Amino acid sequence: CSVRAIAQCSRFAVLRTTLMRLITQMASSAPSALHPILLCDFYSKLFIMYIFNNFINTLRRYKASSLLNVIGMAVAFGAFYVIMTQVSRDFGYNQRLKDADRTFIIALPSNYSPGKYNTWICRPLGEALVNGSSSVECGGMFQAWHGEPEICWTRHGDTVRKMRLTTMEYSAGGIRTMNFEAAEGSLEELSRPATLAVSETFAKKNGVTVGDRISWSDPEGEKNAMEVVAIFRDFQKNSDLGYVEGVYDAGNSHMDSTTEWSFQYVVKLRDASQRSEFETEAMPVMREFLSRLYRIDDSAGEEDKAEFEEMLDRMSVKLVSLKEMYFTKVLDGKPGESGNLTTDITMLAVAVLIILIALINFINFFFALVPARLRSVNTYKIFGVSRSSLVLNFIGESVGLVLLSLALAALLVYAFAASPLSDILSSNVGIRDNAAVMALTVSVALVAAVGGSIYPALYITSFQPALVLKGSFGGSAAGRRLRNVLIGFQFAISIALIVC
């Protein structure tokens, strides 16, 4: 080891001398004001070359440990990235919808699950609640759930195109409340019969334009067709509106029906803090509506009035924010997609534990090589290399290993995304769709590399050259004690992962 270290130091000295001659020649022909800049640039490039050269030599000399380190960290970083795509998707669900913080779905007490609410109401009640509070900016009927795409056809001249389209039913107020924006055409045209609007993605995919007609019953695309009057901008993908491909105006359908409780209503408040105000103002509206529904007036019997008051005591109106919809547990038969907050927190904890295991493995590998590298490190010190340079060299080696691991992790993620295993997640693990998660993974990896190498680097460079021949940390009681602590901690983390 010392012979190799001497050779490396000699090569480094020759390289430094050669480059110094070049920089001197350049400086002699450059203005004096540039001399400090040239020298700074020279030493920075020289130091980078020194670290890179040592990193390559380390890979060559310690092939087995380097390979195991890279593979282990690649699996850990890949697993961390995949898990975090799901966690990021769930915590971001509905969060970027415009005005999501002050947009709420109306819910009433569930008849089937005491203490919970459901979002199904009749249109007369929904309209009354929307119009009965001064805190409402706008509101209307909307559809948070989506069905399966249905086969439909459209005709372009002599060509008929077969498509699959998922449509949803909204009222005009619901369209305004959910902030539909027309990219082409006009959403106001939806008030006309037999019209619909489609999303930008659907329009581009199928070549649909404003003025086209779509039929669900005629393969020729003509009979019973609906006219496309607008193309609306796509919504956030991981949201209840991300599935909307087509929308049409429900008009006055079921507007007078008090027996069809299969509609959902949404309101946008003037301010998010007015939630309790709306819930309070909704109760007189509920009383008036229910009294008409059950014909409770002055002519009603005392027993009927008592039962009615008892029912009102159990009645309440609750607003559930769009931002809370995904994780909320207060709804029975929740519309749209739903998630489990406990599961996501557990997944987040697992991701962190995986990184900790990888970090411990990395530190153990580093300390396992201390006896083999100690002599060469002190040879460098004898030849005048400063301790800070050696520490930075070890940190540079760690960063290099992490970068190799990240490259391999990207390949593993790509293979996972192309395999059937990716179906177990509801998130898209593609790197292009998860730039923030990718940036987080790289940041965590680099921080782990630097943090995990600082103490070992400081330790291995702390010995005086004259004392190196007297013993070995690898066989000392302190060395064994540290390794046992790390292995025990790693074992505890593994047990925690199994339990989770």
Task: Outline where the language-model segments fall.
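Short, strongly hydrophobic transmembrane alpha-helices
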Residues: 61-89, 483-500
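Feature of multi-pass inner-membrane transport and sensor proteins
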Residues: 17-20, 24, 38-53, 57, ...
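Selective transmembrane-helix segments that form parts of the transport pathway or gating/packing helices
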Residues: 70, 74, 389, 394-408, ...
